[in-house]
């Protein structure tokens, strides 16, 4: 390991942040403007001052504090072991030992003391840079030799892909010069000139004389150590102009060059440090820039191949594999493809750091749980799941109908903030691994489930039973509250109430369709008050029930009427003769249902009829609509029963949480079921194909209702107010998410 920790105090968006326990691969994610690039600025500034460069000072996070600090704690365990070994007594080894380890004048700071306390067999070295208001700086270690040596042993390289010259790869030479510890002291300049003179001169002395003439004319400063490294390496290879797959760089696309540049740089970084004690740090800002998603995946895959090639483990050993610690590689990304591949391929050798903003505007950094032991999850972990790590708000649902509902464009137009939420249909395997409650990402979320995932009711025994999820939730709630927490007593009381439900009898009526006195709505409300802490919301009914209720019933009837009037076409290529024939066969007053069924069907196209046919068709439709409404109100006792019949017809459940299929299997509510069956076969035959999940009725009904309300109300606020009255559960979920998103947006822009 290269770095043990980085601490930043009162600089840029950082109030006081400590990053520690780095892995070989460190993937940084987060929304724009949360401080990801500020980490790069801080590290870059620290190293610039380490190398005595003049750079623009960093802004303070708050001017109430007169100073800012950057503290790097380096892991010197390996280098100390090397330089204290009897085998290594070279000049540079002695210099390292005398500079870093022999002196007792270097005091340990708090981070170093903590690090030593936690690992007595390890060696650490901390260096703090203090920035003052007058732009002056102070180092915790005065000796410039120490700082220079740290810059040599732990070099820093950064790549901002948006700003690199994709046709000039010379920065790679700088990298190469930083990754070795060659000794040039024994290289005699005159001997080198004589050697070359002997090898390349056509006549003895020609090369030497040529060099002498050049030196007599020009005046140059001596090569630095790094320049010597580059020149000696270039002499030994066939050329120093980079090509990509044998082609000149200018002939390649920007994306191809960017990918190859990064691959080459990281390949060299890993390869050249396997037998060196220099431990570099590299930071790549948005490596995905200019890359196709599949090429972005290949970038991580190829990095993993070279990483694995040299890695020595108990299972993998042999020539060419080393236990040498890898460089610390950081890359910040907005790419789900890169994040996905990092998590899947690097396992425990990676970590994901999630940057977000606190309410006060300072940067928060959370280490995400990004290692998974569940191979089922890793097998299905795709870009769809990875993109949730970048979400502003996540709504986890349990069905395609919910996806259709919450992604409805008409709704999103009325609630623009909600359009920023990710709606995700998650099974239990994915939900257990990807929800922010597990990953520890600072992403607000809610898990929406039906109440029947918690409880089950038997019409025969008139008793509830608690499902496993309820038992699990009770355990989680108990853990969430401390015994002395002021809210513990209230939650404990609610938990006891929930547990008592299964031992009490709840009478039903109307053949088990409704409860007699028990209110499922009240139970759901009480559950949601305490489950909110677990980011869970349980709907009193299903999505079908939330859409079809007593408040929405008038709109549902109007929607059915709209389907009849606008979507039903004449079921014959000769409409004039056909409609006359059907009129003669069926009496419009006493046989309107068979007449309607014979004449009309749901049509994809809307042919133009003669005015006479239009009038005849409209008369039949209106007669049928009047008959349908009268029949519905005569067949059922009240609107509560009408709503239930429609819910069940469209795949919903009774108040006692029975579907039509379950009622049939248990032999319950036979008369009620028979009524629904008759409606499906006769009066509502044209809707029967839509009475299934994802058939499209949710979208068409919701669009119709919003359009209808829009025509009734004067502004969006009144439209939203009416929607909240008609669909209270649905809109409360949307409003809660919107409020959270708007608050987050405000903190980012404020």
Curated annotation (Swiss-Prot):
Chain spans, region ATPase domain N-terminus: 1-173
Disulphide bridges, residue numbers: none
InterPro entries per the UniProt record, alphabetical: ATPase_AAA_core, Bact_Antivir_Def_Nuclease, P-loop_NTPase
Record keywords, A-Z: Antiviral defense, ATP-binding, Hydrolase, Metal-binding, Nuclease, Nucleotide-binding
Positions of ATP binding: 33-37
Chain residue ranges for the region called ATPase domain C-terminus: 261-390
Segments for region (Dimerization domain): 174-260
Extent of the signal sequence: none
List of residues binding a divalent metal cation 1: 398, 450, 452
Region (Toprim domain): 391-704
Residue spans crossing the bilayer: none
EC number, UniProt record: 3.1.-.-
Chain sites annotated for binding a divalent metal cation 2: 402, 623, 641
Manner of cofactor binding, per the entry note: Probably binds 2 metal cations.
Single biological process term from Gene Ontology: defense response to virus
Domain of life (superkingdom): Bacteria
SUPFAM superfamilies: P-loop containing nucleoside triphosphate hydrolases (SSF52540)
Requisite cofactors: a divalent metal cation
GO MF assignments: ATP binding; ATP hydrolysis activity; metal ion binding; nuclease activity
Homology family: Belongs to the class 1 OLD nuclease family.
Protein name from the UniProt record: Retron Eco8 OLD nuclease
Organism: Escherichia coli
Encoding gene (name): old
